[in-house]
Amino acid sequence: MSSSANSSPATTKFKFTDNLWDGFDLLVKRTDNDLIQSKNILNFFKKKAELEEQHSKKLEKLSLKTMMTIDESTSINAISYNSSWKKIINSSMMESEQHTLLNTSILNKVIQPLQAMIKDMETKRKKILQEGIKLKQDMKEMVDELKKSQFKYDKAGKDLESSRMELREYREQLDHQQQQQPSDSDLNNISKIERRIQRCEQDFSNCDEEYREQIKATNDFQHLYNTEKLPKILNDFEHFVISHSHFSKSYFTNLVSVLIELPSAYQQNYEFVKKSVEMIDITNDVQEFIRKNLMKKQLAQPFQYEPYIEGKLTKKTISLTWNNKILSQFSRSSNNNTATANNTSSGNLNPYLNGGIGGTKKDEPILPTASFKVSLDELMNRQKDNHPTLEVPYVLQVLSTRIAQMKGHVTEGIFRVPGIISTIKETRLRIDKADFNLSNIDDVRTPAALLKQWLRDIPTALIPDSLYQQCIDTPTNAIAIVKTIPIINQRVLCYLINFLQIFTKFEFVAHSKMGTSNLAMVFAPCILRCTSTDANVMLNNVPNERLFVETLIKQIPPPLNTNEFLNLPISMSDAINDSEDIEELNDLDQLSNDDNNNSNTNTSNISIGSGSNSNIVVNYSNNSPNIESSTLPSQSVVTTIETLPPLNDDHNSGSGNESNSSSSNSTTTPTGSPTTASKPRGPRTQTLGWVRIKPAPKPSAEPTITLSSSIAAGTTTTTTTATGITTTTTTTAGPEKTIISPVIIKPAAATPTTTTPTTTPTTTTSPTTATIPAVSTSTIKTSSPDRTTPLTSSPPLASTKSTDELMKKLDQFTQETTPSIRIATTTTPTTITTPTTTATTTTITTDKTTPVTSSPPTASNISSEDLMKKLDQFINF
């Protein structure tokens, strides 16, 4: 009997399902270690086969090369010696063949089967692992649901008990007051409490039913967990371990057979290896593994229904006043925050609820793959394998890249406007689980908020606490302070500042409204952490913290190994939503924007013609006038017309007054007074770093006006229509003239034209083109609902002027660099087209003769030949 008792423990066969019940994690490590060991064995045999092949080739090459040196034809060689030497070389050739055969055998009988086994085992292990993790998760969810239902049940019981206590105490107070008949208010209060008790009883009944159903569902799943699910997974692990050992042993046996098949010279060397392989005992190895990790199989007890027992709540004094009732309700709600373990009679629901499968803790542990609340050194060490060349934490690059992809640099209020809290928490949890795919995020505020959270959650601030006071005392010395912080902190801080410098570009700030100061204010708490808990100190340090970060943004240089956008998906075109609605402003626009404040190009086309073959077009593009010339009929009287830049709605009062006064003065200038020309503004040479969106054009109705009048010479006539068209005309000496009857003004499409500036005078013998002087005395204004475009004409040459004055005037025109236009008065209808800044043109058509000037001047002391030469010179110019 004693012998059998002593032998029984040794003959007991262990099983995973009985002796490793809670060994899921242990088996995961064991199977992973088996696969790693098999991969090491595979690499060893691969290297051995490679060396055998190399040795075979080298030995064969050496033997052939040596054999070629033997010369049998000569008579001076010893025959027996040469014969023996040739046999030695041939034996080396045979040895080379044996190495080749060994290499082939190892490849076919060991390496290839072992490689296939590893691949198959990895697939099986992955499937078992997924099933086990899912089973554990399902069990955890069931226990969590049971925990919630029990909490609701206990809470409903507390509410019911509290209401009953309130009613009982209320009635006791009425009895103490010895009132013969309760008042209406007392009866009303009692009725309210009774109705509340009814609701609480109904809620308690529903929660009780839900609690019982959840207990049944959890017990059913736990039974399935204990009898089928978990035993199957443990059996799969056991089969995996045994199969792995069995296959490995068979491949070792194949190797031994290959070695034994070698010639007898090698056989003795591998006899010991053969014996050691034969001694492998898989069953004993498995039993020894279980014996070393014995676990007691202890199944969890079924969940029991635990009824709520009254008497947990302490007696409270309830006053008849409503204020005390409200305070008592707050007191009761605060008492509801007690531990869940006290909600049941036993005080303990299940081992799972206290750190078991479904256990939850107040302070969640940091995941092994977490990126938040982890030191910079640990993050850098963790990413050495996957991102060896990255000098900053990978999470920082992922968040900044996603912000750039979602155009955060042109998003208004970026980093300042908060995101959706639930989305931020969900995304943060995904990142902590090493899921850095943020492509499904549709709100740029989410990665922006996570970037700030990541900076705030670093255990040690980017600027160490020991340097905080120095940063507050000397915020302008930020660069020198940054040089003293750790290297990894410097890299992260420089990357962050270079990233923020992108947002400070004028083009992006125009959209985001987040300049250097705003960004510094937002990121100061992320970079600096106040060491004091005094609210006054923290508040007083805010300006210096902001100044410190602002100094960093302004003084830290851009990186050398990347572009200005850190190789992020950012370009300057992101600031332009529509090329037609965006303009650049240059420094000249800042100095003199009275004439053009909302457009980068001002295009005005003026067509004044006599019939279909006489036309002059002036195109203003980029404030540089380009003139297209056409034919004017001969014997035309010449006058001048200048197109003034359109008035803008957003002018200040000063500029508007200046423009109005100039127009008013031009209409009252005497006919004989000389005119002076001002140079147009030159081409833009430098653009500012920001843009402005032009206002959308407003639709304008087609205005129609008919004017018919006779005016005397030397008078000024101003006519304004209901549609906002103002016509001002100054007449010269001469008979009365009938003007503009009828006049039709209609919008026309504007076609910008670019031509070469030319200036040509008008003669009486050939068609010419003329120029536009800079000053005029007669103005025609066309007003649309949103723009006013003045059209100004200068006075004609007076008949009283001498030829000398005319020659001086031509010399002056020759020296001027400003192109101008002279328009001949004809007896055919005249068309004037002036596009406004709203991309429409206004056409004025006159059907009657519109004389503008008096008779041509007469020569006084110069011949016609000299005059023609001067005109030719002017034409050539």
Curated annotation (Swiss-Prot):
Where would I find the F-BAR domain in this sequence? Answer: 14-285
User: What residues form the membrane-spanning segments?
Assistant: none
Q: Where in the cell is it found?
A: Cytoplasm; Contractile vacuole
Coiled-coil region: 130-214
Instruction: Provide ranges: composition bias, Polar residues.
Output: 780-800
Identify the residues that the record assigns to the Rho-GAP domain, covering every copy: 374-560
Q: Which CDD domains match?
A: FCH_F-BAR, RhoGAP_KIAA1688
Q: Which PROSITE patterns match?
A: F_BAR, RHOGAP
The record places the site described as Arginine finger at R416
Cellular component terms (Gene Ontology): contractile vacuole; cytoplasm
Q: Where is the composition biased (Low complexity)?
A: 593-612, 653-676, 749-779
Q: By its UniProt entry, which Gene3D superfamilies does this protein fall under?
A: Arfaptin homology (AH) domain/BAR domain (1.20.1270.60), Rho GTPase activation protein (1.10.555.10)
**Principal localisation:** cytoplasm
Keywords, ordered alphabetically: Coiled coil, Cytoplasm, GTPase activation, Vacuole
| Protein known as | GTPase activating protein homolog 2
What is the primary gene name for this protein?
mgp2
